A protein has these predicted regions:
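Intrinsically disordered, low-complexity regulatory regions
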Residues: 3-100
Length: 100
């Protein structure tokens, strides 16, 4: 019986890894598109600027959840979360650059 539970657990963990890879890939594709349009604009104001943009995204999430509506161009909660994912990565990139 314990073997059955171990297999179930391992299957769940493998699926989580696949899910994470999908989220990472989706975020990367969006980053590529936006980077083509905007370049390194996110770096202009440094980490603080990225954190401000993250705050804007969090506020948008709160409004979407509270009012069950979208705010800009039918932006959904998932889209905003992917943006947050990318902003976090951008902040890490800037921090890494500062450490060099």
């Amino acid at each position: 019986k314990i073997f059955k539970y171990i297999l179930i657990y391992l299957n769940i963990m493998a699926n989580r890894i696949e899910q994470m890879e999908m989220v990472q890939n989706e975020g990367l594709e969006l980053f590529k598109k936006k980077n083509k349009d905007y370049g390194d604009a996110f770096a202009e104001y440094g980490v603080i600027g990225v954190l401000v943009r993250m705050g804007d995204k969090i506020k948008r999430l709160q409004n979407i959840e509270k009012n069950q509506i979208t705010l800009v161009n039918d932006e959904k909660m998932k889209d905003t979360l992917i943006d947050l994912h990318n902003y976090a990565a951008m902040a890490i990139m800037l921090l890494d650059e500062d450490d060099k």
